[in-house]
Amino acid sequence: MTTTLPAYDEVVARYEPVIGLETHVELGTNTKMFCGCPTDFGGAPNTRVCPVCLGLPGSLPVANRAAVEATIRIGLALNCSIAEWCRFARKNYYYPDMPKNYQISQYDEPLCVDGYLDVEVDGEPVRISIERVHMEEDTGKTLHVGGATGRIHGATESLVDYNRAGIPLVEIVTKPIPGAGAMAPEVARAYVTELRDVLRSLGVSDVRMEEGSLRCDVNTSLNLPGEQWGTRTETKNVNSLRSVERAVRSEMIRQASVLEGGGRITQETRHFHEDTGDTTSGRSKETATDYRYFPEPDLVPVAPDPTWVAELKAALPELPRLHRRRLQQEWGLSDLDMQSILNAGAVELIEATIAAGATPTAARKWWLGELSRRANEAGVELADIGATPEQVAELQGLVDAGKLTDKLARTVLEHVVAGEGSPAKIMADRNLEVVSDTGALTAAVDEAIAANPAIADKVRGGKVAAAGALVGAVMKTTRGQADAKTVRELILERLGVQG
């Protein structure tokens, strides 16, 4: 089998990818899915548990109405049909973090089916079909101690915390997505991005991928044009938007390498490694038969009242696509400008910066310029760069007030990103404020003129452009803390020349 990985362009020239995504969303309810234990994060291990979520004999679950309502709202926002009748099922498997040795989920009768989510990739619309949206409970958490990677291999002991067991989850499963071609990684990222925005607008979850409240499994397969779809792999728990895109691309390249070497793709789960961008084998992928699903005997079926569903639909908030369209009109942006904001993942950041007092133009300038550059260099999402919308608005306010030049503002922003505090504090602590003392500026200008008589004579003789050298000398004297426009005006005034 070949060990040489083909170039991505070679992969998409020869093979057609098919992708699919399974997304687990941790709902922001106050209590667990089937008991009254609190869901808030951070308690000591095994303190947020009870006989129900520990699966002790004789305990009986009761479905959380708030979780059912949140699931219906998600289904409606994803254009799903809401079942008139659905029921829970037991998904049987054995693992230390599963106290009952089964998970209460839904199988053949989910709450929401046959929806879709429209996304945009490079300005082109793509419709992603949703197969199902169903409720289930989360598992506990296993901590492997002693291994170098935090995994079971090499660990000396494993500890189990059941605080997370029973937390309400919603699983959103797409139908297979063929036809994306070379854009398959971008389509996957666009879908998860749009889904995250929809969930956030509904207020059903904080959808923090880095904290696990939004977890994404990516299915990938390759086939030759005109042939049956290939064997798929499932890359588990991809924890950032950037990683979703990288995981699809990496797995496409890996599968092509296997196929080109005469090998066969194994149906399995795989782990994505953030540091290398590679996937490694996890375990063989189970089928539905392996889980021995059967109806949950301890829970009655759920039959949402159509009137209730209609009320929930009528109360849905403005969803992200309509929200962005309205903002584009309010901000007076072209489709291309709006697309650049979408591509950077900056809609909410810019909107919040405007709400904090900045103009749309200024907010776009900072988030799509200096901050995007820093995020790309650091390999992080723009929202994680270390600056808040409020800080960016404050920074622009200092520029507008004449206390900072754009150059000084970029210096201040560097320290904001480093976590040193607010722009005003950094400006004061580092003495970065624009020199506004007229006497000090006049002295610096006179010094520059005296030190450069030949240049001064050129300016007096009508070569006004030569004043740039004198401006540079003053800026050097003031360590860049003077306003260049003000300095130029003062130089021309002192030389008796009109600008």
From Swiss-Prot:
<dbReference type="GO" id="GO:0050567">
    <property type="term" value="F:glutaminyl-tRNA synthase (glutamine-hydrolyzing) activity"/>
</dbReference>
<dbReference type="GO" id="GO:0006412">
    <property type="term" value="P:translation"/>
</dbReference>
<dbReference type="Pfam" id="PF02637">
    <property type="entry name" value="GatB_Yqey"/>
</dbReference>
<dbReference type="GO" id="GO:0005524">
    <property type="term" value="F:ATP binding"/>
</dbReference>
<dbReference type="InterPro" id="IPR017958">
    <property type="entry name" value="Gln-tRNA_amidoTrfase_suB_CS"/>
</dbReference>
<dbReference type="InterPro" id="IPR004413">
    <property type="entry name" value="GatB"/>
</dbReference>
<comment type="similarity">
    <text>Belongs to the GatB/GatE family. GatB subfamily.</text>
</comment>
<protein>
    <recommendedName>
        <fullName>Aspartyl/glutamyl-tRNA(Asn/Gln) amidotransferase subunit B</fullName>
        <ecNumber>6.3.5.-</ecNumber>
    </recommendedName>
</protein>
<keyword id="KW-0067">ATP-binding</keyword>
<comment type="subunit">
    <text>Heterotrimer of A, B and C subunits.</text>
</comment>
<keyword id="KW-0436">Ligase</keyword>
<dbReference type="Pfam" id="PF02934">
    <property type="entry name" value="GatB_N"/>
</dbReference>
<dbReference type="GO" id="GO:0070681">
    <property type="term" value="P:glutaminyl-tRNAGln biosynthesis via transamidation"/>
</dbReference>
<keyword id="KW-0547">Nucleotide-binding</keyword>
<dbReference type="InterPro" id="IPR003789">
    <property type="entry name" value="Asn/Gln_tRNA_amidoTrase-B-like"/>
</dbReference>
<comment type="function">
    <text>Allows the formation of correctly charged Asn-tRNA(Asn) or Gln-tRNA(Gln) through the transamidation of misacylated Asp-tRNA(Asn) or Glu-tRNA(Gln) in organisms which lack either or both of asparaginyl-tRNA or glutaminyl-tRNA synthetases. The reaction takes place in the presence of glutamine and ATP through an activated phospho-Asp-tRNA(Asn) or phospho-Glu-tRNA(Gln).</text>
</comment>
<dbReference type="InterPro" id="IPR018027">
    <property type="entry name" value="Asn/Gln_amidotransferase"/>
</dbReference>
<dbReference type="InterPro" id="IPR014746">
    <property type="entry name" value="Gln_synth/guanido_kin_cat_dom"/>
</dbReference>
<keyword id="KW-0648">Protein biosynthesis</keyword>
<dbReference type="InterPro" id="IPR006075">
    <property type="entry name" value="Asn/Gln-tRNA_Trfase_suB/E_cat"/>
</dbReference>
<dbReference type="InterPro" id="IPR017959">
    <property type="entry name" value="Asn/Gln-tRNA_amidoTrfase_suB/E"/>
</dbReference>
<dbReference type="GO" id="GO:0050566">
    <property type="term" value="F:asparaginyl-tRNA synthase (glutamine-hydrolyzing) activity"/>
</dbReference>
<dbReference type="InterPro" id="IPR023168">
    <property type="entry name" value="GatB_Yqey_C_2"/>
</dbReference>
